[in-house]
Amino acid sequence: MAKIIGIDLGTTNSCVAVMEGGEPVVIANAEGNRTTPSVVAFKNGERQVGEVAKRQAITNPNTIMSIKRHMGTDYKVEVEGKDYTPQEVSAIILQKLKAQAEDYLGEKVTEAVITVPAYFNDAERQATKDAGTIAGLDVKRIINEPTAAALAYGLEKGEDHTILIYDLGGGTFDVSILELGDGVFEVVSTAGDSRLGGDDFDQKIIDHLVAEFKKDNGIDLAQDKMALQRLKDAAEKAKKDLSGVSSTQISLPFITAGAAGPLHLEMTLSRAKFDDLTADLVERTMAPTRRALSDAGMTPDKIDKIILVGGSTRIPAVQKAVQDFTGKESFKGVNPDEVVALGAAVQGGVLTGDVKDVVLLDVTPLSLGIETMGSVMTKLIDRNTTIPTSKSQVFSTAADNQPAVDIHVLQGERPMASDNKTLGRFQLTDIPPAQRGVPQIEVKFDIDANGIVNVSAKDLGTNKEQSITIQSSSGLTEADIDQMVKDAEANADADNKRKEEVELRNEADQLVFATDKAVKDLGEQIDAADKEKAEAAKEKVTTALAGTDVEAIRSAKDELSTVVQELTQKVYENMAQQQAGAEGAQAGGQDDNVMDAEFEEVDDKDNK
């Protein structure tokens, strides 16, 4: 059976893994790194992904970072005259990870398990699934990142215990409490903030640097795009440095220019100052942590293990806050950057049957309901309900002879409908005339194992039914997704063709150089006609290289290659003939100089 790969599609970095010999294994990228920056850049029609895209972000304004923060919204980014949705940009990253896995496995990969933050709403989950489809992947399961981390951690653990997963990534924060035992991974509660992550810690440093520089030089670096990108890179590096040292030097020469000439940014940032700048962010993570414990009906002493996930959990202040709250040190036996992808690979193994005796019971992170009279949200499914699940409730009309009801589907925890997230709307029509309160309208919610919602409404009097599968709020239809799949495939083909063209041009250019060298080295050994023929073929290649016709380059290169081969063959033949002639002459000369000599046999006996 074909492998199902596990993908951690992160805000800052992404990672791909697969089950090999009963163990999840991270697949390194072409650069040899185990994680790939979630960065996409466009340059003259060419797409760059990962490390190469991140490296040129300072000079290329068409660089897209942290697109995950916009999943499930109608946000679009315009690049080189084309609008890209977050799904399309994410699909480009997924395509790279897919190709990475195919290179490693030596076979085509078509199926994947993709992780999302536990606190992602339905629209964000659907958008992630769409991104996978656009990338040419059949997304077999969407699972929550903390749950994936628990799968990777608990695969070989036999004993029953309760774990708290604290997941602070580049752009999102989740905390989940799970009970593990006998191969059952049961999520008891989950909470989080899908707008909080390492990017926000970077931004605090950037704001500090901008403010200090403005105070010293009167120039606002926030208005300079190139300076801002340099500041972002420096802030990210400083944050990482401060996880291991107590202070770090930030040095950005020629950051901008003033009236007197170039200006440089030189600043020392201490860990104490960094902790002060980011104290509010660390505290923001503690509110969901407290809520998750409360929802689980637990106190910190009931937690057996704390597992930290996500690169931002390397920040000492974050580790201290978690330890102070729980009274326990975090478990150090997992790599926070890789554990989620490893868990996704385990889930892939569960689906293919490679991993046995593992049952995953996840929960819905937010309550689901509909708007009822008075703009109130009436909940049908409470948060932290184990999924998949189904729940129905009977409602009625609010007015006499009401011919239709609007079903406004909501997700959230607030009592008023307007304060919650709208997942979708649909209408049940042709309700027979009746006094208000008489018609019986059954509303049913279904949540599948991916956490994606289906809602139906049925008039119990007429059995007329209307249903809706909640689409991402970006409004992508099946036709939109199909078109994006075709575009992605076409772009992949175009990328391959562009690579082939570059290789062909390099080969042709190298052949021109080799021809020049051969003609020069052989000199008088080539007759004028052959030299002229080689020059003409070489000129044809040079002309083709100046144009855009790939076939013309290939044809001219092949022609020059043939001419050069014939030329060198003729030279070798001439050299062979000359050598043979020289050897013959030498042999003849030796015969002429032979002298006849008389000899007399001497008997040794006579000399004794």
Curated annotation (Swiss-Prot):
CDD domains: ASKHA_NBD_HSP70_DnaK-like. The modification Phosphothreonine is found at residue 172. GO terms for molecular function: ATP binding; ATP-dependent protein folding chaperone; unfolded protein binding. Residues 593-608 have a biased composition (Acidic residues). Induction: By stress conditions e.g. heat shock. The keyword Thylakoid does not apply. Residues 576-590 have a biased composition (Low complexity). Residues 575-608 are annotated as: Disordered. It comes from the Bacteria. Keywords: ATP-binding, Chaperone, Nucleotide-binding, Phosphoprotein, Stress response. Acts as a chaperone. Belongs to the heat shock protein 70 family. HAMAP family: DnaK. This is Chaperone protein DnaK. It comes from Exiguobacterium sibiricum (strain DSM 17290 / CCUG 55495 / CIP 109462 / JCM 13490 / 255-15). The gene is dnaK.
